[in-house]
Amino acid sequence: MRKRNILGLFVGLIIGLYTVLGMSLFTFFNLKYHSVYYAQHIPHKEGTDPDLVMLVENMGWIYTPEIDGIRYDNDGTNAIINTKSKSFLTKSSGSFLYDKDNMTIGFDSTFRFEDVSYFSEEAKRTKVNESKIKREIRKDFSPIMKVQPKPLINLQWLFNIIYQSRFN
């Protein structure tokens, strides 16, 4: 009788442990795979772009369909290349970089404008308009964001708890 109780307790603990582990893994994968969807719906401060941040940060986790003119480079740092507009978006040392027309625009970890680097005299004469640049980025990479699937089990509330302080 005593062996039965110990065995039952042991089996119950193992089942409970596997259940908690399974739920934790499901939650982790759900938040990563649907991060762009959740980021599109998170309340955030003006000037921050959580969806663009999640697009690059979680490129290895999100749905990355084959789209004509879009290439994904994840052999070290994540980069998304638009071959039609000859631009790319990447993350480097905690910042985000957008490269187009012989200039690289730097953004901080919340996608707020930081700096510009020019690689030609012609590019130096170009005035940088932050809102115009962000519209170009959205135009170049919106085909990826538009096809992100809606989660079956919506964990928006948990995503908001985790990332709210970063984007406000």
Task: Please state what every model-predicted region is.
Residues S87-N168:
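Non-cytosolic head/periplasmic domains of membrane-anchored proteins
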Residues L17-D99:
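N-terminal export/targeting and maturation segments
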Residues M1-V20:
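N-terminal Sec-pathway targeting helices
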